[in-house]
Amino acid sequence: LYLNPIFEAASNHRYDTADYETVDPLLGDEQDFRTLCTEAEKRGIRVMLDGVFNHTGAKSRYFNADGFYPAPGAAQGPISPYYLWYSFHPFPTDYDAWWGIKNLPAVNERNESYVNYIITGENSIVRRWLRAGASAWRLDVADELPDEFIFAIRAVMQQDFPDAYLLGEVWEDGTTKVAYSKRRRYLLGGGLHGLMNYPFRTALLPYLAGTSGAEDFRDAMETIRENYPSPAFYGAMNFLSTHDTPRLLTLLGCEQPPADRDARAHYRLSPAERERGTALLKLAALVLYAFPGSPTVYYGDEAGMEGFEDPFNRRTYPWGHEDTALLDWFRTLGRLRAERESLQSGDIAYPLAAGRVLCFARRAGDEVSLCAVNAGAESASVDLPWAAPLAHDALSGQSFLAEGGRLHITLAPYDALLLTE
């Protein structure tokens, strides 16, 4: 269960941390968090926290731009113990900030005091919240953190919490990433365990939208597979939407996105757009659950939530108004993923990837699962290798007879199969 930032902050998104030691009272308190982690673990669920360590909020106990906190912050000058966490040019009006956004002053991650506070101290932020029950950290803007900072977090986690997981937010291929003129090393061992797999979404969306072919998706994913260490590829955080992207249902359904921001704020798909978008979203979800990696669902996607960019993609969950058919689809995919070892850890091969048709097979030992997707508006006939005499579609319950080690199947428009032996 990946939570966006939970710590006290001035905004509702909380990427402008005000106090790393305090849960935002809008959400509850530390005891509530501990209870959540305890009850989640009883149900086989672990909690991952969002670590925003590249910058703080200007309205924070550390910077204290508005003087809200009684103790001096960096904005009050060298009297503050946090003054050297930030870089002023000159004090007090000009300072380094994340992408120049002044309410997000950037910290110096090489400052010894800051590293001790966040990572290495006996009661550091990393240690404190893992002791409180968290099982993982997701590092916000990981490619803007020094490699040494990431390695230090991993070392502390490995020492005190060897089962804890360290995930990084990187939007590109993490093995070829260059940031601030330096090739990043966080996937070479001793750094991040894995990454958010934005390349998966970046390749899947145009295939489903019809602006690229299945072969383009295959090629993009094979590049990632070739470049990534195997644990990072097979454990990548795959997703369809995040808090930083428009919801996939809206992107796939909307025929002509409004240019005006206010229009996007109030936009709702027409019945025809929603029907098409839902059909494509179901295909996307199937690929998500059948593909190597860890399928991750942004809250509400499974219920049919719509929304363009932030903040329109962050509305409240539609309690009592969910798309129940879509919910059932996601539940079915989750059950199949849990039941089939091939979908969890199997190797991948592509017997067919051309145009609107994407077929990939997962194999673990003697178990095979083959995902066949037609993202086109017309029927498609496919000819696939199949060793067993019969193929069973785990989605519809249909069975197909193989002839001479081949399956000859027609896929309806916007249709898919998950074939098992």
Predicted regions mapped to residue ranges:
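Active-site-proximal helices and loops of the catalytic beta/alpha 8
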Residues: 37-45, 55, 60, 64, ...
